[in-house]
């Protein structure tokens, strides 16, 4: 399914503009692939972002994906077991990895554009185990001294919680399947694939949820 098509065509839960639906925050799905679990010690290796869009009928759908491979930041570690899980080959000739600052610039630009498009104040990170992604993102932002981070520094929407409530599943693959979405295990643990699947899952849940009649 193309990423710019609505996931669900149920009756709209809300006709509030995006700028009011989530208190001025634009949901943006993020997934990172890393060299381990410690954001202060392990390298950020991949990042992907998908802004959540809204059509004229009030349905949420995934926007365009922005992604980057990253050159491991100097002084950070990479656990070989993490590379086994993700399948990342650091010296692959077609990896085209960017330095951290350039990678953040690349993925932040379309996020800021989407925030502006919908008249929102800032982006809020949506992720599966979202604080893992946010902690690695914030660590990279701090390392390079990035001044234009569009994301809220600590608030998130976590699809682990949402999927647990909606489907009784907390593992991304099982939650996606419970939501009626396709899942390809061979593509999992790619930042792009996991982000796009998480975006579809978020939209599926958000479109089915009875949204507020008004919001501040």
UniProtKB/Swiss-Prot annotation:
Signal peptide: none annotated. One of its GO terms (cellular component) is cytosol. InterPro entries: Exonuclease_RNaseT/DNA_pol3 (IPR013520), RNase_T (IPR005987), RNaseH-like_sf (IPR012337), RNaseH_sf (IPR036397). The record marks 37, 132, 154 as: Important for substrate binding and specificity. GO terms for biological process: DNA replication proofreading; tRNA processing. GO terms for molecular function: 3'-5' exonuclease activity; magnesium ion binding; nucleic acid binding; RNA exonuclease activity, producing 5'-phosphomonoesters. It is an enzyme of class 3 (hydrolase). Mg(2+) 2 binds at residues 31, 33, 189, 194. Pfam families: RNase_T (PF00929). Residues 28-202 form the Exonuclease domain. Its cofactor is Mg(2+). Keywords: Exonuclease, Hydrolase, Magnesium, Metal-binding, Nuclease, tRNA processing. The active site is at residue 189. CDD domains: RNaseT. Homodimer. Belongs to the RNase T family. This is Ribonuclease T. It comes from Xanthomonas campestris pv. campestris (strain ATCC 33913 / DSM 3586 / NCPPB 528 / LMG 568 / P 25). The lineage of its organism: Bacteria, Pseudomonadati, Pseudomonadota, Gammaproteobacteria, Lysobacterales.
């Amino acid at each position: 399914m193309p990423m710019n098509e609505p996931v669900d065509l149920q009756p709209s839960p809300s006709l509030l503009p995006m700028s009011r639906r989530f208190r001025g925050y634009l949901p943006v799905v993020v997934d990172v692939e890393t060299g381990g679990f410690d954001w202060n010690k392990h390298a950020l290796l991949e990042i992907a972002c998908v802004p959540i869009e809204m059509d004229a009928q009030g349905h949420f759908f995934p926007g365009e994906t922005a992604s980057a491979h990253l050159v491991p930041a100097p002084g950070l570690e990479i656990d070989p077991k993490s590379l086994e899980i993700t399948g990342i080959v650091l010296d692959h000739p077609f990896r085209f990895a960017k330095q951290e600052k350039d990678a953040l610039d690349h993925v932040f630009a379309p996020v800021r554009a989407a925030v502006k498009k919908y008249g929102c104040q800032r982006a809020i990170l949506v992720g599966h185990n979202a604080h893992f992604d946010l902690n690695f993102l914030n660590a990279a932002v701090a390392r390079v001294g990035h001044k234009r981070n569009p994301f809220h520094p600590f608030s998130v929407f976590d699809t682990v919680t949402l999927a647990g409530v909606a489907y009784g599943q907390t593992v991304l693959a099982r939650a996606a399947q419970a939501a009626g979405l396709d899942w390809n295990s061979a593509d999992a643990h790619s930042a792009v694939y996991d982000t796009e699947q998480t975006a579809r899952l978020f939209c599926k849940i958000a479109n089915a949820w009875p949204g507020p009649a008004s919001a501040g």
